[in-house]
Amino acid sequence: MEARVLWLLALVLALGSSSLADQYVGLSENLCAVPAKNRVDCGYPEISPEQCVNRGCCFDSSIPEVPWCFKPLQDTECTF
């Protein structure tokens, strides 16, 4: 009986973790709303959007002459 419970638990954990990995959609838009003049480069020339996002960075190629792969804004936490 105990072995069945362990196998069931392992199965549930494996299925749960794989479904969470598929749901990652990148950083939220508000963290990537960095003004062009404040962008800090996070990549290298010719980096793809996918490679940039995999580094935990934002990608926006709509503005020339500024970094397209850049560090996101820091998520702030309210403390009282």
Curated annotation (Swiss-Prot):
Q: Which GO terms describe its molecular function?
A: identical protein binding
- Annotated disulfide bonds: 32-58, 42-57, 52-69
BP terms from Gene Ontology: maintenance of gastrointestinal epithelium; regulation of glucose metabolic process
Q: Where in the cell is it found?
A: Secreted, Extracellular space, Extracellular matrix; Cytoplasm
- Pfam families, sorted: Trefoil
Give the principal location in a single coarse category. secreted
What Gene Ontology cellular-component terms does the record carry?
A: extracellular space; secretory granule
Ranges of residues in domain P-type: 30-73
Q: Which InterPro entries match?
A: P_trefoil_chordata (IPR017994), P_trefoil_CS (IPR017957), P_trefoil_dom (IPR000519), P_trefoil_dom_sf (IPR044913)
| Signal peptide positions (record) | 1-21
Keyword list (alphabetical) reads: Cytoplasm, Disulfide bond, Extracellular matrix, Secreted, Signal
Q: Which Gene3D superfamilies match?
A: Spasmolytic Protein, domain 1
Described by its record, this protein's role is as follows: Involved in the maintenance and repair of the intestinal mucosa. Promotes the mobility of epithelial cells in healing processes (motogen).
Q: Which PANTHER family match?
A: INTESTINAL TREFOIL FACTOR-RELATED, TREFOIL FACTOR 3
* Quaternary organization: Monomer. Homodimer; disulfide-linked.
Protein name, per record: Trefoil factor 3
Which organism does this sequence originate in? Felis catus
